[in-house]
Each structure stands twice: as C-alpha cells, then as structure tokens.
Amino acid sequence: MQTAYWVMVMMMVWITAPLSEGGKLNGEIRGLVSHILIPQHTLRSLTSRDRSDNGGSSGAQICIWKVCPPSPWR
C-alpha cells in the first residue's frame, strides 16, 4: 500500500513538474525517479510482453490518446 501511494505521488509530481520555471525542477525530479517508473518504459514493457505472448507481431497498431500513426500502405 505504501508503494502504491509513493508511485501515485511521484506520478503527480511527474505531471506537474513541467509547469515549474524553466523546466529545471522537472530535470531534477527525473533524475530522482527510477527509469522503470516512467510512462515510456511502462508502455514499452507492456507492448513487448504482449508481442511475446502472441508469438510475434500481429500487425496491430498501438494508438496513444486515440492518435494512430498512418500505415505505410495507405
């Protein structure tokens, strides 16, 4: 329970830190947060786990915030 609370607090700081003056605080906080907790790493680990479970790439696109990259054959 304490870990979940700490992760929630750190994610709130991660979201609000870019609002700080000049982004200096944001850079310092990023240095304190483990690279495992950053959203990009979490997304990457979820997609790699999904691909390994399916036995390879199924050709499905991952859309973030409902914005999908265009397919090369469109």
Curated annotation (Swiss-Prot):
Positions of post-translational 4-hydroxyproline modification? P69, P70, P72
Q: Which GO terms describe its cellular component?
A: extracellular region
Q: Which GO terms describe its molecular function?
A: toxin activity
Superkingdom per UniProt? Eukaryota
Which compartments does it reside in? Secreted
Query: Which protein family is named in the record?
Result: Belongs to the conotoxin C superfamily. Consomatin family.
A further note on this protein reads: This peptide is an evolutionarily optimized stable analog of somatostatin. In addition, it adopts nearly identical conformations as in the somatostatin drug analog Octreotide. As this drug, it contains a D-Trp at the same position, whose synthesis is a common strategy used for enhancing the metabolic stability of compounds in drug design. Consomatins evolved by gene duplication of a 'Somatostatin and related peptides (SSRP)' gene expressed in the snail neuroendocrine system.
Name of the protein this chain belongs to: Consomatin Ma1
